[in-house]
Amino acid sequence: MSKPNKFRRIGSLAEFYHAASIPWVATFTLNKRYLHPDYNLTWWKRLRLVFRLWRNTRRIETGTSYKAQAAIAAKLFEIPRAVPGVVVECGCWKGGSTTNLSIISKIAGRSLIVYDSFEGLPDAEEGDRHAKPEAKGLYSGSLETVTSNV
């Protein structure tokens, strides 16, 4: 019996664009001049990290792009290792961002704490500028799904 393929073939021009932009994201979003020297992130290490972020967002559904996650990594890597703190994710849906944040947190030497009600988005309330009533329950997930994906 053949082993299941964990990777999807690039099937659209948009997917090709995202794959082709990996070196650019590694170079410009994770710009070495802004990263703290504690992390010793060479261009090859940054390229590998961005590739892993991209691969995981293709493997596990996530509400954010790998580019947004690379931007989060860039902000985190500006902070010296000696500064105490943890990384917190509020809402993990299926665990795609959690998977990538765990990689980023490990490189940064920080713990990742994840919170989720697994009920999805709440009801829209008066005063919510961008919330839509039909979004209630969107992004609901389960602990089993997250733990199997992370």
Question: Where are the model-predicted features located?
Answer:
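S-adenosylmethionine/decaboxylated-SAM
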Residues: 46, 52-59, 77, 81-150
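Poly-acidic low-complexity segments
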Residues: 5-8, 119
